[in-house]
Amino acid sequence: MQIFVKTLTGKTITLEVESSDTIDNVKSKIQDKEGIPPDQQRLIFAGKQLEDGRTLSDYNIQKESTLHLVLRLRGGGKKRKKKVYTTPKKIRHKHKKVKLAVLNYYKVDDEGKVAKLRKECPNCGPGIFLANHGDRFYCGKCHSTFATQK
């Protein structure tokens, strides 16, 4: 029987085969006509790739059927080298959680009155405390500095 093989260039080859012929035999006949080695050939019929050991009748290939020839692509992407670091990774700073830290800002006296231990920023308002640097007070929010009088 006669089958057609359509190549990548759009050229159609006619082959004389039997339904009992294997895909290997068909590929060797294509090699004789086109010079493409069988290990680089992929034959497609009805959207399926044809395996080498099977016969034409296994795929229900009848007379005047058209097979599509595509070339096999070898390999994949180039392997990338793993980065080697010369210095060890910097250890991330871990926040130390202090339980009941708010007790450091206020003091309760014997009479039950609450007194602030730190000064509040006059620019930022209540709740923003100034850092005490001995000779001066500093606001971390608005970056104001207040000098203490001696």
Curated annotation (Swiss-Prot):
GO terms for molecular function: structural constituent of ribosome; zinc ion binding. One of its GO terms (biological process) is translation. Residues 1-76 form the Ubiquitin-like domain. The keyword Metal-binding applies. It comes from the Eukaryota. GO terms for cellular component: cytoplasm; nucleus; ribonucleoprotein complex; ribosome. Pfam families: Ribosomal_S27, ubiquitin. There is a cross-link at residue 76 (Glycyl lysine isopeptide (Gly-Lys) (interchain with K-? in acceptor proteins)). Ubiquitin is encoded by several different genes. Ubi3 genes code for a single copy of ubiquitin fused to the ribosomal protein eS31. Ubi4 is synthesized as a polyubiquitin precursor with 5 exact head to tail repeats. In the N-terminal section; belongs to the ubiquitin family. In the C-terminal section; belongs to the eukaryotic ribosomal protein eS31 family. This is Ubiquitin-ribosomal protein eS31 fusion protein. It comes from Kluyveromyces lactis (strain ATCC 8585 / CBS 2359 / DSM 70799 / NBRC 1267 / NRRL Y-1140 / WM37). The gene is ubi3.
